[in-house]
Amino acid sequence: MKIVISKPDKNKIRQKRHRRVRGKLSGTADRPRLNVFRSNTGIYAQVIDDVAGVTLASASTLDKEVSKGTKTEQAVVVGKLVAERAVAKGISEVVFDRGGYLYHGRVKALADAARENGLKF
């Protein structure tokens, strides 16, 4: 008899963690939410006003300014871009939503770059 132990799906666990955090976290017009999504090939960041349901600023590895480098280096550039675009629209304070990901690696690099370029969280 063969016993198979199924491994939990990492993305499903992340989504569950994200839903749990999102129940307590919301962005307003005064202090919007900086959301991060990480895929295998890229990283995406949006500044969202949850009350109006509007994206105020965004940046990703699909932008022309972000092309070369490692994934962590690209995350730094995305953090810089999203912060510059948010500050240009008069947004200085945000709520950081790590999307259920660990605050480490690419997510941390993006957050640090956003802080260095004028966003407070």
Curated annotation (Swiss-Prot):
This is one of the proteins that bind and probably mediate the attachment of the 5S RNA into the large ribosomal subunit, where it forms part of the central protuberance. The keyword Transmembrane helix does not apply. The keyword Transmembrane does not apply. Keywords: Ribonucleoprotein, Ribosomal protein, RNA-binding, rRNA-binding. It comes from Streptococcus equi subsp. zooepidemicus (strain MGCS10565). One of its GO terms (biological process) is translation. GO terms for molecular function: 5S rRNA binding; structural constituent of ribosome. It holds the Pfam family Ribosomal_L18p. Part of the 50S ribosomal subunit; part of the 5S rRNA/L5/L18/L25 subcomplex. Contacts the 5S and 23S rRNAs. Transmembrane segments: none annotated. InterPro entries: Ribosomal_uL18_bac-type (IPR004389), Ribosomal_uL18_bac/euk (IPR005484). This is Large ribosomal subunit protein uL18. Gene3D superfamilies: 3.30.420.100. Belongs to the universal ribosomal protein uL18 family. GO terms for cellular component: cytosolic large ribosomal subunit. HAMAP family: Ribosomal_uL18_B (MF_01337_B).
